Amino acid sequence: MKVLWAALVVTLLAGCRADVEPEVEVREPAVWQSGQPWELALSRFWDYLRWVQTLSDQVQEELLSNQVTQELTLLIEDTMKEVKAYKAELEKELGPVAEDTKARLAKELQAAQARLGADMEEVRNRLSQYRSEVQAMLGQSSEELRARLTSHPRKMKRRLQRDIDELQKRMAVYKAGAQEGAERGVSAIRERLGSLIEQGRLQALASQPLQERAQAWGEQMRGRLEKVGSQARDRLEEVREQMEEVRVKVEEQAEAFQARLKSWFEPMMEDMRRQWAELIQKVQVAVGASTSAPSQEP
């Protein structure tokens, strides 16, 4: 579409181009047939330039006024507004897309949009410049005026065409990303619905009558208590058996120790009794001898 604008601007700037070179036929892009608001705005921009072209001999007089640049300013603003609105709509559709992908697409589209706006501004500025040149060239011949007005149009046409193609390509990528995001969103919704269905099933189980749940809970607790009681009884029986084994071992060890002590001390006590008896006997003998000696002295 920008190419179309550029071509129109070129022919507009050419003024009375019929005597200089054949009119360049410009084909309207097929993309306008989709009817997007921003494309319709660009179409209006194109229609206005084409209308200016039909002024033929009146072009010089129109360029001397501010009407053309004012109209172009309004059309540029409308076009940029529609492009931004369409971009915002695509951004909403890109919700489920990864943030890095969304940021990259937005950056590329913003750059293409900026280039389009800059070139449209240049078209308007060129017209203002040509209007000033026309004012300065009053009195010159029509051929000289036409030659000045046709100096830049071809370059502007190529630039606008390139920008339009770039913007359309970015829009297509952006829309493809939005469709991909929508598909991911549907998958996420499907998974969410599955989760909600599962939760609903669990809630249905949880909504059983309170009495049934209490009865089930009571049976469960009784089963657990019986299991714990059985385990406790088994454990106590094991402990009792272990204690009995320990008692028997202690008694056996005590009897063995007592027997060892008896085997140690009985010979010793017997020897001490024997020695003590011998000592007493010796003392008695000594005492008896000492008592018999005084009786024999008179």
From Swiss-Prot:
Placement of Sequence repeats on the sequence: 74-95, 96-117, 118-139, 140-161, 162-183, 184-204, 205-222, 223-244
Modified residues (Phosphoserine): S141
Keyword Protein transport annotated: no
PTM: APOE exists as multiple glycosylated and sialylated glycoforms within cells and in plasma. The extent of glycosylation and sialylation are tissue and context specific.
Region named Specificity for association with VLDL: 260-272
Cellular compartments annotated: Secreted; Secreted, Extracellular space; Secreted, Extracellular space, Extracellular matrix; Extracellular vesicle
Any one GO cellular component localisation term in the record: intermediate-density lipoprotein particle
Entry-linked Pfam families: Apolipoprotein
Binding site for heparin: M156, K157, R158, R159, G218, E219, Q220, M221, R222, G223, R224, L225
Start and end residues of each stretch annotated as LDL and other lipoprotein receptors binding: 152-162
Modified residues (Methionine sulfoxide): M137
Self-association state and partner proteins as the record states: Homotetramer. May interact with ABCA1; functionally associated with ABCA1 in the biogenesis of HDLs. May interact with APP/A4 amyloid-beta peptide; the interaction is extremely stable in vitro but its physiological significance is unclear. May interact with MAPT. May interact with MAP2. In the cerebrospinal fluid, interacts with secreted SORL1. Interacts with PMEL; this allows the loading of PMEL luminal fragment on ILVs to induce fibril nucleation.
Known function: APOE is an apolipoprotein, a protein associating with lipid particles, that mainly functions in lipoprotein-mediated lipid transport between organs via the plasma and interstitial fluids. APOE is a core component of plasma lipoproteins and is involved in their production, conversion and clearance. Apolipoproteins are amphipathic molecules that interact both with lipids of the lipoprotein particle core and the aqueous environment of the plasma.
The protein, known as: Apolipoprotein E
